[in-house]
Amino acid sequence: MTDTRKPPRKKPQRPAKPAAPREKATLHPRNRHQGHYDFAKLIKSSPELAAFVILNPYGKESIDFADPQAVRVFNRALLKAFYGIAHWDIPADYLCPPIPGRADYLHFLADLLAEDNEGVIPRGASIKALDIGTGANCIYPLLGHSDYGWQFVGSDIDSTAIAAATTIIKANGLSKAISVRQQDNRKQILLGLLDSSERFHVSLCNPPFHASLDEAQRGSQRKWRALGKADPKRKLPVLNFGGQSQELWCEGGEIGFVTRLIQESATLPSQVVWFSTLVSKASNLPPIQNALKKAGALEVKVIEMGQGQKQSRFVAWTFLDKAQRTPH
């Protein structure tokens, strides 16, 4: 007997949401920004953020990271909610950094110092850190002091950045923990900056990574295309997180800047226990490692980091042997 019943009608399927991309790398275990951002918590702390919250293609709350004002307000909320920084702002067109990645650099530096301290992370005001190119945002000193209680000296060649960083420091009552100073000679990095009696346990640096303004602008175009924001009819801001020219490019690009930093560090071998710098491209490592060999560094470390889909790294080097590197 033939079954003449019609098969049950299938319900039309709703279009599936795109699958969220799988993370290729994770943040440092001590990083405060694991997983998705708690926007309810952030908005409770900083109500102004509510106006900038959107739903991304995966149905998750986010912000438009191509909007400089949104990124600035978002950073302000993160700093207030997670680090107790109640007052933070930067001038227009200055670098507005992604905080989780900046925090990772500091956590891995803390691990590096722990290796010379019987595995214990050194904390407190006895630990001195030098932030080369601290910028108007003063982000590394703010995070490093909040997480580890370290004392910071920040340097910059830009008087506007120095003024903005000073305002942030004073507004948050951190003048005893963080100070900033201007490098008056734009051709020097460390030379002429430090007093001969000063000693630091670690230095850190986020170097300019382009060799020219044109190269920086091409990099901006690539980033905006990736964000789906490129519009050939209008002038784009230089990179989606802002940035003044001296923050983004210098003669010789990243390799040129880091090579100069290495050469100058060799003239001050005992004033900083561990020198370090971010390196934006893995392909830049061989010439940097060659420069370190020529400079006579006793030990060199390349530390890989990762934030979601982004891979990053920093190079650390020292001219001191193990016995000379005790943190206290």
Curated annotation (Swiss-Prot):
One of its GO terms (cellular component) is cytoplasm. The lineage of its organism: Bacteria, Pseudomonadati, Pseudomonadota, Gammaproteobacteria, Pseudomonadales. Belongs to the methyltransferase superfamily. METTL16/RlmF family. One of its GO terms (molecular function) is 23S rRNA (adenine(1618)-N(6))-methyltransferase activity. Its main location: cytoplasm. This is Ribosomal RNA large subunit methyltransferase F. Residues 1-31 are annotated as: Disordered. GO terms for biological process: rRNA base methylation. It catalyses: adenosine(1618) in 23S rRNA + S-adenosyl-L-methionine = N(6)-methyladenosine(1618) in 23S rRNA + S-adenosyl-L-homocysteine + H(+).
